[in-house]
């Protein structure tokens, strides 16, 4: 559902000044989601975290290694630096902090959406989100 809601959130944020979208890396599925989360965090050292996140979540179908390599290229990342930054202690600490924060506010699954005082632990349509913003 994260891939399904991603373009809707980006569209809302681009259309409305009163909407702010914040992505926390909160891997819960498997080692692959953990590695991809580390990769997105490491991309921030090159100021390309959002670009990589967007490229990954904009890809169609299952994320293959080929699609991931293409997302890295499309994001304009230096891949060698990205691999080094993924192994930094800081990257690991940021990932653990992000998961800690997500868990601390009740996010047990993904996507988790907070709209003012409302919390949804799952997918919401764009229309549902707009109704909650009123």
Where are these regions (language model features)?
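C-terminal cap of thioredoxin/glutaredoxin-like
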Residues: 1-13, 70-134
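Structural alpha/beta surface segment adjacent to cysteine/selenocysteine redox centers
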Residues: 3-73
């Amino acid at each position: 559902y994260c891939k399904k809601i991603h373009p809707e959130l980006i569209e809302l944020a681009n259309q409305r000044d009163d909407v702010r979208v914040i992505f926390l890396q909160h891997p819960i599925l498997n080692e692959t989601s953990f590695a991809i989360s580390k990769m997105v965090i490491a991309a921030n050292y090159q100021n390309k975290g959002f670009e990589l996140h967007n490229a990954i979540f904009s890809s169609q179908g299952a994320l293959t290694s080929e699609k991931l390599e293409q997302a890295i290229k499309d994001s304009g990342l230096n891949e060698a630096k990205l691999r080094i930054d993924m192994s930094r202690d800081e990257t690991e600490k940021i990932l653990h902090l992000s998961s800690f924060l997500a868990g601390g506010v009740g996010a047990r699954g993904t996507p988790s959406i907070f709209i003012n005082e409302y919390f949804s632990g799952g997918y919401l349509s764009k229309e549902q989100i707009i109704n909650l913003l009123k």
